[in-house]
Amino acid sequence: MLQRPAAFSACGVVTLTTDFGLKDPFVGVMKGRLVAHFPAVRIIDLTHEIPAHWPAEAGFWLARSFRHFPLGTVHVAVVDPGVGSAREIAAVEAEGHLFLAPDNGLLGPVLDTATSVIARRVAAPVLVRLGIDAPSATFHGRDIFAPLAARIAASQLAPADLGAPTDELVPGWIEQPRVTAGQVAGTVVTIDHFGNLITDIDARHLHGLPHPVVRVASRELPVRRTYSDVRPGDYLALVNSFGVLEIARAERSAAEGLGLARGAPVVVVTK
């Protein structure tokens, strides 16, 4: 983990990433607590459709999304199967942003890809001083993360107030692609709304492959620039707007057509 000063100055924006969904009132209640503590807060939903109990996907999207927000944004991510246990809370400064999440590996992708990081565990005395010493056992998003994020976003609390720097946060869940001569082996990390299979293979992994093809589900797929480079119904691979390789099917669902799910192997070779 690289530790360098990451200049953070709160801008009043808070993003939310959870596995709560929108059927129940959990997201609304979190927003209510944020506004109650900081009426001028600007709240942006990144996503509330992370698969239940799967912190790895939350970290994957955070690491590829946070740079699109203004410097000084507080990013709150709550995918917390260990809620109410002895697991701690992680606070990470990276490139002028601040991330709050359970210390369960969720922030691993941020730690792995950011160019400047200061990681902390939120000290118990800080929570006591803020009156966050008796949270419910099952809803720390409301009782801990929301009031903590609001105070930071309002510049009432600085990252340095949260605890001493550490390099011992729980590591991330997503392994790096395996790169060898003429080949990159990765996996499907998630499936988007359109049925595209999103992999952990970054565009940079393809630089050493002059004529890449993708092997997946006993097929070899061409790497193209846009979905319209093939006919409707045809399969292809491309580097998407987040800079990662995805498997797609023009105007169809690649996941349904190929019968693949999260964790499926994907190999890129040169022809």
What do the predicted segments below correspond to?
Residues M1-A86:
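N-terminal glycine-/serine-/threonine-rich phosphate-binding loop
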